[in-house]
Amino acid sequence: MREILISTESGSDLPDALVRKYQVYVAPMHIIMDGESLDDGCFPIDRVFDYFDETGRIPTTSAVNEGEYIDFFHKLQDEHPGCVIYHFAYSSVASSTYSHAKLAIEDEGFRDIYLIDTKSVSGGCTAYIAEAYKLIQERKATVMDYAALAEELQALSDRIECQFIPATLTYLRAGGRVSNASYLVANILNLKPLIEINSDGRLIATKKYRGSMRRIVDKFYKDFLRRYDCQKDTLYLMYGKGLAQDVLDRMREIALENGFKDTQYVMTGGTISCHGGKGAMGIAAVTRISIV
């Protein structure tokens, strides 16, 4: 039986406990402030918020580049001779990480590295990797065709649902994603956009919620749980640093009230926080297998 490794990027926001539990290898994306490139996940997230408060500018983000992937994959193969690697990439339409990993694999002629497009971000990637780990554990003792297993793992993308709500549009406006007029109206009416990850992996704004995070948490979570037929193993509770503790507690209460056996908090890291800012709230889940 060959050793199977799981790898991903820091934009997956996989909590440290799950990195250890699933033995995941993480390639850092990058956060750039005043021309200095920092590895995402290797510095306190408060630096992102402090930088914006001090300068009025949001840090920029950059993907893992092809050369970094080549070094990353070589290191894994050198340390684990004969291994098979399944790399779970941040949504290919939301970042160039996927295309850079694909180029690295093709240009360097790597064998036995299979690239999976999660078509998701942050907590959605976390949910994906957790479900993929379970599937790999079920298959690893008998698997003969690693490419076929990769196809099964890619098919999981149809069953991952992820949504989040920024607490403020300030960062989105600073990044040019929201007009000044829209920002002004949203502030006056206390509107917060729902950001959904669609089936292609695109982040799209759909409906709007009105009120504070405390006021909208129940409706947001219950709307999601009514819309999707979720597996009841684990509900992934996404949050940006700064979200009030009572809102965090209520997120978990709603999950348990709706029959989930467990919950997993996922704090958004530098990549998402550069766009969503402080105190965002989100949810991710694995849906049940449809039987036709």
PLM segments and residue spans:
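Non-transmembrane, interaction-prone segments in cytosolic or luminal domains
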Residues: D50-D53, P59, E79, Y209-R210, ...
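Mixed-charge interfacial surface used for oligomerization/domain docking
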Residues: R2-E3, G11-I32, C83, V93, ...
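Short, charged beta->alpha transition segments
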Residues: Y69-L76, H100-A104
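Glycine-rich phosphate-binding loop signature in dinucleotide/nucleotide-binding domains
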Residues: L76-V84
